[in-house]
Structure formats: C-alpha cells, structure tokens
C-alpha cells in the first residue's frame, strides 16, 4: 500500500497526527514510506464543553487520544489558541506536545541526525534537558528509520525542573530563577510513557536521572555524535558541556538550544569557547 491512505494507517498505528509533521523515511517489508511524527500539539480543535454525548467529556477525551486526536481547549475564544508562528519557532509552552522547541529547531535536529547517520560519524546521541522527551523521541525514531541498532539515545534531566540559581558560584544566573515553574517539572515515568506511546522505548534509550553535576561526569558514554544542550542556565549549561564536549566525535554536532534566547546560557558557551 502506498499514498495518503497508507500514511493515515501509519499515523493511526503510532498515535500521531498529519498536521505540521516532521517526516522521516523508513521501510518495512520492502515498502518505503514516510513515518509521521506530530510536532504541533493539536490535530483537531474540539470544544468538549459543548460535547452532547454519549459519555462524559473526559471519556470522549480519552477516546480521542487513543486515535491520535488532541483536545486543544474546553471552550472560549478561538483567538486564544497558540499562534502558529510561536509554535513554529518554539516560543510558547504547548499544553500537550512532547516538545516545546518548535518546528524550526526540530528540523535542525533532524538534519543533524541525518548527517550523522548518512556520513557514519561515530557516537551516541544525547540531549541534556529533555522536558517531555520530544527531541529525544525524534532522535530514537530516526535511528529506527535508518536501521541503526548500535547507537544509544541518552535522555538526561533532573526530571524535577530546573535548579534554583546558585548566584554565588554562577552570578550570571541571577534574576533567572524558574525553579518553581511546575510546567517544567516532568517526571521520568512520564517521559518513558511518551517514548512508549511511539513504540520507541527500548534498550537503545538510556535515562540519566539527576542533576547534571551528579550524573554526566560518571555517565557510561564513550563517544557522542550529537550533543544537544537545553539547560537554560549558566550552571546547567556548563555542568553538561564540560564533561561531554570532549566526547563529541570530529564531524559531530553540538547544538545549544538557548544560545539565542537566554543570556546565562549564551555567556556559559562564550566563556567555554574562550577558555578552550
């Protein structure tokens, strides 16, 4: 089977949507097709506050989610929905998506991973600071699509949100305390469940749970092809970059999510480059 109908089957099987997708190639039984990963958090705008039944709104929501549909709101002004430009650039915090980085940065990840796989650059893939796991899910999905069974995807996070700034040691983090933001506190079990929903939770996915200063220097990582930093703060960026940079293979990628948006992160990278 080929074409749109087959794409719909694949989307249904993997619980994903076809709107604003990131697609990557894969093959099964000699048939090449595009596997679709949802990027935008909503597929359909369903107002459950006016749902007539049968069943309750919560039951309807659960049923829709099993088919890859996402509920965007429970009523209200449609103008309050997330702006597509914000979502594309990753400048909002979507309520249900597995990632907040947006389509442009996801395309950057896709391009980097494709280059690593196509050119045979050795090493594993890691993201430090994963939120709900979307970027690392994409990484693992691409390994599957390329038939790479050797590399691992490392999922590194405190799974407790960000640390409170230690301004005595890292004065550049002063005024950037988001340690109490509950939206950023996504537990490891939830991230594992997100991987599992795509059928991608397996031995090639390794979790590093804890603060970066406590986990990354001792992590059993020999070589990296991609190091993606998403720690926001000077401290978190430094705690990840210092132990891992030397493990990046020649031709590999270091991607810094917050370099253009968070001054503490930018300063940490600039200082590291000056010192090295």
Question: Model-derived features: where do they sit?
Answer:
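Short linear motifs in intrinsically disordered/low-complexity regions
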Residues: 4, 21, 46-48, 78, ...
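N-terminal pre-P-loop "Q-motif" helix
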Residues: 105-108
């Amino acid at each position: 089977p080929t074409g749109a109908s087959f794409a719909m089957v694949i989307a249904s099987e993997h619980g994903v949507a076809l709107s604003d997708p990131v697609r990557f190639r894969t093959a099964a039984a000699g048939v090449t097709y595009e596997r679709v990963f949802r990027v935008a958090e909503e597929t359909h705008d369903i107002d459950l506050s006016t749902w007539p039944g049968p069943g309750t709104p919560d039951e309807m929501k659960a049923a829709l989610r099993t088919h890859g549909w996402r509920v965007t709101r429970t009523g209200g002004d449609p103008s309050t929905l997330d702006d597509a430009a914000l979502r594309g650039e990753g400048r909002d915090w979507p309520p249900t998506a597995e990632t907040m980085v947006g389509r442009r940065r996801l395309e950057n990840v896709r391009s980097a991973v494709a280059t690593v796989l196509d050119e045979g650059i050795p090493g594993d893939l890691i993201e430090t600071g994963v939120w709900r796991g979307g970027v690392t899910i994409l990484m693992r999905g691409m390994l599957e699509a390329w038939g790479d069974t050797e590399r691992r995807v490392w999922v590194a996070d405190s799974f407790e949100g960000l640390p409170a700034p230690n301004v005595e040691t890292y004065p550049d983090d002063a005024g950037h305390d988001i340690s109490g933001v509950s939206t950023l506190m996504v537990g490891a079990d939830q991230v594992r469940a997100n991987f599992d929903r795509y059928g991608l939770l397996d031995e090639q996915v390794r979790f590093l749970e804890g603060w970066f200063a406590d986990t990354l220097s001792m992590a059993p990582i020999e070589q990296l092809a991609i190091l993606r930093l998403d720690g926001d703060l000077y401290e978190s960026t430094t705690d990840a970059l210092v132990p891992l940079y030397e493990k990046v293979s020649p031709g590999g990628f270091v991607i810094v999510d917050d370099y253009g948006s968070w001054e503490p992160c930018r300063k940490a990278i600039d200082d590291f480059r000056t010192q090295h």
